[in-house]
């Protein structure tokens, strides 16, 4: 049974927010009020449906005392009683504490790991996979930085993805992605194993992370493309080093001013993510074992091209739909990861 007093508190809070927004809240408050209102709206809809189901059940049980209505009530009661546990479970999931970063845009970073040029090619495949997934969701996909490799792969890529639920859905992608396939350069037809690392970070605002000027060193350098060829004749590329943590961020677009903006944007996201991980570990020693822990060194997934198979090792999910997945069809994978994470958090909350 879900505590009714807690549900009523949520409804009252929602009604308060609705009244404030209708009355014309102060401009400085509108964004925060609107965000909270949007978060509570689906929860309040679940509460309304649950209360209606309880009322229908009570009405049917009362009908048992009426000889003329008893047969009808006996027909309806099994269905009505079966609905209550399902709706209570849906409510418990809706009431799970939300990750404050879920509504933010996502910063996506992809780097090849072991495997040389084949790893760089696979990193490029992953970048295209996420771009197609983002486009299918109607999200905005902005490539912030791209360093191509010799044979058309990538040495490093950074992108910003903005849209409803972008970080909430993509945050489970952080970790090591392993590929097993025959490289195009392999004359003997042997299967090679290589890997790429994916990091998905919530975008951070300046108000979230203050970076004193004394904490960073900014270096400029010559922009270069594939094979080390100079893209232009000015020192436009920017490398920013965060001295307290040693984090290094680079951006090599043609505009030095834009490169500074991009590098600071990515640096803020990384520092914000570090703080989020620190707080998560402080809240729960078991959090590392959950799907959304974001451990960058964890091998999370294998893409086996000869078998057309993708396996997510965290939840033992195997799908024989690799061409569709590489084309951006990640819906089933992300839904399974989300459900697993929700179940783990629900168990932790109720323990």
From Swiss-Prot:
Subcellular location: Cytoplasm
GO cellular component: cytoplasm
Alphabetical list of Pfam families matching this protein: PCRF, RF-1
Posttranslational mods: Methylated by PrmC. Methylation increases the termination efficiency of RF1.
UniProt keyword terms in alphabetical order: Cytoplasm, Methylation, Protein biosynthesis
Keyword Oxidoreductase found: no
Modified residues (N5-methylglutamine): 229
GO MF terms, alphabetically ordered: translation release factor activity, codon specific
UniProt family annotation: Belongs to the prokaryotic/mitochondrial release factor family.
Record's function text: Peptide chain release factor 1 directs the termination of translation in response to the peptide chain termination codons UAG and UAA.
Protein name: Peptide chain release factor 1
Organism expressing this protein natively: Cereibacter sphaeroides (strain ATCC 17025 / ATH 2.4.3)
């Amino acid at each position: 049974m879900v505590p009714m007093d807690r549900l009523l508190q949520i409804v009252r809070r929602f009604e308060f927010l609705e009244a404030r927004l209708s009355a014309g809240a102060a401009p400085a408050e509108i964004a925060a009020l609107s965000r909270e209102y949007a978060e509570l709206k689906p929860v309040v809809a679940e509460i309304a449906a649950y209360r209606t189901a309880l009322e229908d059940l009570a009405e049917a049980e009362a009908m048992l005392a009426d000889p003329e209505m008893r047969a009808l009530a006996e027909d309806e009661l099994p269905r009505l009683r079966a609905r209550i546990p399902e709706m209570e479970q849906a409510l418990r999931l809706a009431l799970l504490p939300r990750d404050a970063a879920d509504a933010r845009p996502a910063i996506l970073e992809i780097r090849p790991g072991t495997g040389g040029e084949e790893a760089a090619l696979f990193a490029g495949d992953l970048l295209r996979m996420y771009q197609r997934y983002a486009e299918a969701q109607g999200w905005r996909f902005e490539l912030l930085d791209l360093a191509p490799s010799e044979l058309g792969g990538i040495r490093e890529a950074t992108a910003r993805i903005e849209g409803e639920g972008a970080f909430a859905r993509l945050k489970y992608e952080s970790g090591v992605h392993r590929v097993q396939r025959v490289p195009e350069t392999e004359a003997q037809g042997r299967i090679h194993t290589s890997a790429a690392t994916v990091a998905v970070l919530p975008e951070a605002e300046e108000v979230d992370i203050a970076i004193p000027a004394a904490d960073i060193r900014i270096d400029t350098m010559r922009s270069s493309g594939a094979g080390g060829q100079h893209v232009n004749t000015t020192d436009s590329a920017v490398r920013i080093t965060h001295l307290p943590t040693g984090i290094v961020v680079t951006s090599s677009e043609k505009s030095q001013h834009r490169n500074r903006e991009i590098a600071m944007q990515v640096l803020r996201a990384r520092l914000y993510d570090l703080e989020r991980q620190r707080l998560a570990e402080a809240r729960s020693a078991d959090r590392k074992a959950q799907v959304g822990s974001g451990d960058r060194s964890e091998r999370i997934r294998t893409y086996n091209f000869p078998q057309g198979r993708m396996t997510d090792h965290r939840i033992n999910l195997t799908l024989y739909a690799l061409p569709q997945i590489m084309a951006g069809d990640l819906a089933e994978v992300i839904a399974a990861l989300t459900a697993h994470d929700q179940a783990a958090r629900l168990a932790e909350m109720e323990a």
